[in-house]
């Protein structure tokens, strides 16, 4: 069966950026898992695949029988133009499925200049950019990586952030849209996990020079101070 993606690949540079199927990529039947997770890197394929953290978390999640982690990267301008022309939404490499139907999307925040790409990727997926505009029909959107320590510039976008090393915490924050908890109940539950920051559960006050004056919890489940997660035993985690 020829898909829309197959049809437009001949019109773009470096089409193998969008085909998947590389050595060591993971193929599962989405119907056999409980959670579909999209690991999103807001840059092109070449840059994303050079990132060691992606490989660690990708295989860490895919080692679980109940989870399917797929890769989602920012298309280059020629591919983006073709996607818009053909009404094609942002997709995952492994299955080619639209990420709108996933349970959770995790963006790694490696550098601030990628923030506009995060917004663009959500728009290409037809997913509301602001967390407050997304109900349970949309994926939960989380952020991690070095820039998550300064979360406020993009706090309105994300449902929550994972601070520190995610090899442990990623197992504790799985979200399935068909589960019993609604989005707020889910966020209240994970807000009690070490290293999890839920922006909507805090009021941020600014000084006149736009620096942060105070961060005050507005939800009883929110920790007064969120501390980064530290991996205590690297022998227990996946290493590519």
Go through each PLM region and give its residues.
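Conserved alpha-helical elements of sugar-nucleotide-dependent glycosyltransferases
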Residues: 49-57
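N-terminal [4Fe-4S]-dependent radical SAM core
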Residues: 8-38, 45-46, 209-240
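Glycine-rich beta-alpha loop elements in corrinoid/cobalamin-binding modules
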Residues: 75-217
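A short beta-strand-loop structural module common to alpha/beta enzyme folds
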Residues: 65-78
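Short helix-loop-beta junction
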Residues: 56-68
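Flexible, glycine-rich loop/tail regions that form catalytic "lids" or insertion modules at the edges
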Residues: 38-41, 103
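Charged, often flexible domain-edge or linker segments that flank or initiate folded functional domains
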Residues: 2-16, 91-94
């Amino acid at each position: 069966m020829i898909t829309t993606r197959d049809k437009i690949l001949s019109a773009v540079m470096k089409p193998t950026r969008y085909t998947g199927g590389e050595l060591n990529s993971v193929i599962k039947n989405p119907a056999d898992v409980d959670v579909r997770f999209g690991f999103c890197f807001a840059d092109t394929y070449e840059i994303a695949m050079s990132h060691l953290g992606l490989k660690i978390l990708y295989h860490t999640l895919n080692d679980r029988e109940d989870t399917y982690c797929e890769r989602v990267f920012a298309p280059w301008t020629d591919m983006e133009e073709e996607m818009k022309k053909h009404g094609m939404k942002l997709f995952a490499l492994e299955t080619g499925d639209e990420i709108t139907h996933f349970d959770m999307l995790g963006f790694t925040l490696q550098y601030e200049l990628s923030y506009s790409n995060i917004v663009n990727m959500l728009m290409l997926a037809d997913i509301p950019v602001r967390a407050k505009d997304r109900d349970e029909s949309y994926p939960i959107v989380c952020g991690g990586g070095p820039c998550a320590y300064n979360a406020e510039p993009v706090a309105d976008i994300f449902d929550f952030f994972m601070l520190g090393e995610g090899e442990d915490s990623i197992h504790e924050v799985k979200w399935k849209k068909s589960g019993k908890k609604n989005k707020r109940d889910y966020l209240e539950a994970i807000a009690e996990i070490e290293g999890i920051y839920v922006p909507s559960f805090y009021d941020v006050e600014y000084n006149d020079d736009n620096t942060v004056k105070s961060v005050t919890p507005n939800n009883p489940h929110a920790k007064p101070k969120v501390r980064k997660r530290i991996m205590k035993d690297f022998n227990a985690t996946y290493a590519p």
